[in-house]
């Protein structure tokens, strides 16, 4: 399972959570309100393949007037941590403008642990695509965004397809990260990402011509800026060190 797939899975589960009647936001969500993710810090701590039962746990940490923060873990059925994410998002009205978060959401704020554990490595099969071994990594969320683009950065132009867009008709973080992985592969770098710091700044839509700019920023770290003309749509630093 690749990092873009994990990001997409976590987003899908967040929308399910927002629609849960017990959270109290279902009415607003069905009217077209929702959280626009501004920042994500995500790390996979283990490989995981097909056929493994897992669940996504989510907790709300902080709620402001229009911005909220939360944590998510993807855990194996036995509670062992597979991936971890910290998210910061803005509450948007159907018009696309910032809106005040409903007061009911503050009741869901919690300092409780998500309950995942480091656990033991599952044995797996070293030669198996579907049941790989699960070596443990730290899963630290400590990358930083690089703002300066070097003059020799690699540049690749991408035409946004309709199939790259979500139900809101724009490219989400998972597909932005997929563009970055594809660009690294073109350069001969590892497209196998396991950790990323993401800053979502603008919306690309079907038919847009965007430029994916990537450059090395550490031993196994690469930074990226996805642009539409002079506008920066997405910034990221990713870690390509193999699990």
What are these regions (language model features)?
Residues 1-37, 90-194, 243:
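Hot-dog-fold acyl-thioester-processing enzymes
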Residues 30-50:
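Active-site-flanking structural segment that lines cofactor/substrate pockets
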Residues 37-39, 69-70, 84, 193-195:
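Hydrophobic residues on conserved beta-strands that form the core of alpha/beta folds
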Residues 43-143, 200, 204-209, 215-243:
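HotDog/MaoC-like acyl-thioester-processing domains
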